[in-house]
Amino acid sequence: MTDRHDVVIVGGGLVGASLAIALARQGVEVGLVEAAPAGQMPAVFDQRNLSFAAATVNALTALGVMQQLRTPTGPIRRIHISRQGDFGRVRLEAQDYGRATFGQVVVARDFGEALEARLDGLSGLTRYRPARFVGFAPDEAGHRALRIADAEGERTLHARLVVAADGTRSAVREALGIGVDEHDYGQTLFVARVRATQAPDGTAYERLGDDGPTALLPRGDRHWGVVHGVAREQAETVAALNDVAWLARLQRAVGWRIGRLVASGERSAYPIARVVAQRLVADRAVVLGNAAQTIHPIGAQGFNLGLRDALTLAEEIARGHDPGTASRLAAYAARRREDRERTLAFSDGLARLTANPSPLLKPVRSAGLVAMEAQPSLQAFLVGGAMGFRGDVPALCRGEAA
């Protein structure tokens, strides 16, 4: 097993594994440092419902990942956005934009299994698992040295480029001296699978409430994926609800658009915070995925943004012999600036506005939704971002061979 690679990725979650696949298919020698042992899924691959934008579906199909899914996905053909207690609403139809779907709903665990199946078939990929990042070692010319700990003890890896894809509290990002800007939304997100008297019909509902958003996502197994935000101080109470009380709470939040809610699967809870890296690159290093930006789930843009980051990086690496040069990384950061800043601003602004219960903001919220419904240009801006086609989009996301 060699300890020298073109690229070492620390973190085998959604973005890290996707980048490893993209680079390996380009012939790049990749080392992947993973916390989970062989045969065990990383914790991120749970029962969460992932909303893949159309651009993301294009890219993952080109990478051979979507074909590995063993369970059906749920197509999103229309989007319905409203706010509890306000009169405005937005309704979007994919066919109005020349598309069959806005994207697909995929269960995180199913996606993890598909990634694993794809990783298994790659040459040029060395997997270190279970292993953890310990720190950086003295560098050699043209390489970055990093220390990892695995079952055999500590070892030093050498890479022309190190990628930090190790999550919101990234140890690699911290070791690089990259600071973060943080905001705690004071909310907790509950995720579950529910069954209703009406099966999914391709509509994704986003219901905005005083304490946070509630989304209903059309899964491919005739269930709905529910994402329910509550104020942090209510989280323990909501977690303690029995299924009858839990379903009643959801029914009040979403109304009767999908009929009566009749059953719920296990609930998981996640605190919601915004953690944004102050810069994306360092000396022969890049931060990606949640290590680069952990954003509010409203609009379901987190993984979609992270994948566009990863594929843009893969494109830049393909353009030169040395993936870690300062000019290559500067070009990457410049290409990602517009999409990243717009997505961060949209997600954060919408989260803060819609979660603020002040009656003074009610006319603004309602007028905003009414204006969105009436103005095709505003809808087109929303749709372009939601589908992942706004700004400098990687070729695989556009459905082009690369």
Where are these regions (language model features)?
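Glycine-rich FAD pyrophosphate-binding loop
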Residues: A24-D46
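N-terminal glycine-rich dinucleotide-binding loop that anchors FAD/FMN and/or NAD(P) in oxidoreductases
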Residues: R48-R70
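Conserved FAD-binding catalytic core of PHBH/FMO-like flavoproteins
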Residues: L60, H143, R147, A151-T156, ...
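FAD/FMN-dependent oxidoreductases across multiple families
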Residues: E236-G324
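Conserved N-terminal helical subregion
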Residues: T2-R4, T61, L69-A175, E182-T188, ...
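C-terminal helical "tail/cap" subdomain of flavin- and related membrane-associated enzymes
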Residues: E315-A402
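N-terminal Rossmann-like FAD-binding beta1-loop-alpha1 element of flavoenzymes
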Residues: D6-L32
